[in-house]
Amino acid sequence: MSLQNIIETAFENRADITPTTVTPEVKEAVLETIRQLDSGKLRVAERLGVGEWKVNEWAKKAVLLSFRIQDNEVLNDGVNKYFDKVPTKFADWSEDEFKNAGFRAVPGAVARRGSFVAKNVVLMPSYVNIGAYVDEGAMVDTWATVGSCAQIGKNVHLSGGVGIGGVLEPLQASPTIIEDNCFIGARSEIVEGVIVEEGSVISMGVFIGQSTKIFDRTTGEIYQGRVPAGSVVVSGSMPSKDGSHSLYCAVIVKRVDAQTRAKTSVNELLRGI
């Protein structure tokens, strides 16, 4: 049986799987899947085009199964002790392994095993959860969190305190995705499988979930669940039908193409909106 088939079959019987009852075949299949996620050979979601992604549900199933086949144990990274089922990604790495991986991880940065961090990434004191994928050149700034299975594109900047939500269940749901060359402003939260399409700028303190209305003030269109490519987004509000109150929304104040985005600083894009 293929790795995927073993995982799919085991997941159907997951209620019966414990650290003591799991078969050697299933345990090795789960651990191999986690190893492939950790190395970047396998991804929870694969990009088909701008805003279009295919979810590998079986990889998410393997992550969920990994919690069932392992007991909590004391983990020690040389500085702190933890009690968990998932070791940190580079707790026992040598200097050569760090050099080969090609990213920086400053003191206080935590990534769980089963997450992938590409070359030229900088991890400030931050957290990257299992199943996540952080692509080349990304910056994960101080106290930013990358949730389980989240996909972070090339050259993305996650500013201080940003939260990128994790999505393990429902299995068919897409993870939260930040596509290439996006900027996410400080303390913003992107959650519940929202896709921020490439080249977008999210201002400081913007909160976007699946139910958040994203209003394009130029066209009058309202989006939910995705931020169109090249959008510059700030916090706003929309009046109720009777005008008695307003509710939070995100507002697309302008669109920029890749050429403009490359030549213009984030502050300039947000100035005079």
Swiss-Prot record:
Keywords on record: Acyltransferase, Amino-acid biosynthesis, Cytoplasm, Diaminopimelate biosynthesis, Lysine biosynthesis, Repeat, Transferase
List the InterPro entries.
Answer: DapD_Trfase_Hexpep_rpt_fam (IPR005664), Hexapep (IPR001451), Hexapep_transf_CS (IPR018357), THP_succinylTrfase_dom1 (IPR023180), THP_succinylTrfase_N_sf (IPR037133), Trimer_LpxA-like_sf (IPR011004)
* Gene3D superfamilies (UniProt xref): Hexapeptide repeat proteins, Tetrahydrodipicolinate-N-succinyltransferase, N-terminal domain
For whether the record's keyword set contains RNA-binding, the answer is no
Top-level taxonomic group: Bacteria
Q: In which pathway does it act?
A: Amino-acid biosynthesis; L-lysine biosynthesis via DAP pathway; LL-2,6-diaminopimelate from (S)-tetrahydrodipicolinate (succinylase route): step 1/3
EC number from the UniProt entry = 2.3.1.117
Q: Which residues bind substrate?
A: R104, D141
Q: What class of enzyme is it?
A: transferase
Which Gene Ontology terms cover its molecular function?
2,3,4,5-tetrahydropyridine-2,6-dicarboxylate N-succinyltransferase activity; nucleotidyltransferase activity
Record PANTHER family: 2,3,4,5-TETRAHYDROPYRIDINE-2,6-DICARBOXYLATE N-SUCCINYLTRANSFERASE, MOLYBDENUM COFACTOR GUANYLYLTRANSFERASE
Q: Name one GO cellular component term.
A: cytoplasm
Which BP terms does GO give this entry? diaminopimelate biosynthetic process; lysine biosynthetic process via diaminopimelate
Name of this protein: 2,3,4,5-tetrahydropyridine-2,6-dicarboxylate N-succinyltransferase
Q: Which reaction does it catalyse?
A: (S)-2,3,4,5-tetrahydrodipicolinate + succinyl-CoA + H2O = (S)-2-succinylamino-6-oxoheptanedioate + CoA
| Family to which this protein belongs | Belongs to the transferase hexapeptide repeat family.
